[in-house]
Amino acid sequence: MADVVVLDKTPKDPAAFDKYYAETHIPLARKMPGLRKFQVSQGPVVSAAGPSGIHLIATLTFDSVAAVQSAFGSAEGKATAAGVPKFATGGADILFFDGKDV
């Protein structure tokens, strides 16, 4: 399995971020081909040292990194990515990787 982890940094307007994310971004992202699971953080995101500067963490699961690349290259993936500047005003880091159970 492969995961995509998105770290959305604190936006200029958290309420506007949350509204757009829930009403527009999630429905778009859920249409990406090959998406197996989609989770988002709930409540504050903190680090062991305290506040993190991260507003939301999203984890999307696919069968493989190739499936991730295919999904992000699809029309649905491109539409999802095109909306990011509309709400992620604090910036975002997007990481993807193959995982294994240990």
Task: State where each predicted segment sits.
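Macromolecular interaction modules
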Residues: 1-102
